[in-house]
Amino acid sequence: MSHEYQIPNLVLDETDKQILTILHEEGRISYTDLGKRVDLSRVAVQARINQLIEAGVIEKFTAVINPAKIGIHVSVFFNVEVEPQFLEEVALKLEEEPAVTSLYHMTGPSKLHMHGIFTNDQEMEEFLTKRLYPLRGVVSVDCQMLIKRYKSRMGMKL
C-alpha cells in the first residue's frame, strides 16, 4: 500500500475559468483590468491568481518569442527510439540541450518525441551528429522539418 500523498484535483469555478482564459490570451493584463472583465476587485483577482499559482494550476508567466525574428529558422520534430534501459538517461541528457524546446516520452517502442530549434541546417546536423547520435542507447532517429506553422498554442486553453 502506497502512502504517497496525492494532491486532490482543484475545482475551478466559472470565475477562475474566465480568469485563466483571459490570462492565456493576455498574460500582461493588469489585475485592475482583469477584475473589471470578471466583475471582481483588483485584490480579489490577485488573491485568486495567487491561489491558482500555489495550487500549480498556473505554472508560470512567460513571453512567446517568434524564433524567426531572432534568427532561428530551422524547427524540427524528432522521434528518437531508445533502448528501454537507457530511456531515462537519454531523456535527462536531452532535456539539458539548449536547442531542445520540448521532450516527451510517447507510447511505442521506447520513443522520445522531441522538438528542437536551430539557426540553420548545419547547426541541426551538428546537433544530430555530435549530441544526439552518440548518446548511449539511441537506436534510431526520425526527423521532420517544419515547413509552415498554421497553429501553435502555448499551454492549455480552457
From Swiss-Prot:
Keywords: DNA-binding, Transcription, Transcription regulation
One annotated GO biological process: response to amino acid
Span of domain HTH asnC-type: 12-73
GO cellular component, as recorded: cytosol
SMART domains: HTH_ASNC
Pfam families found in the cross-reference section: AsnC_trans_reg (PF01037), HTH_24 (PF13412)
Highest taxon of source: Bacteria
Name the UniProt record assigns to this protein: Uncharacterized HTH-type transcriptional regulator YwrC
Organism: Bacillus subtilis (strain 168)
Gene: ywrC
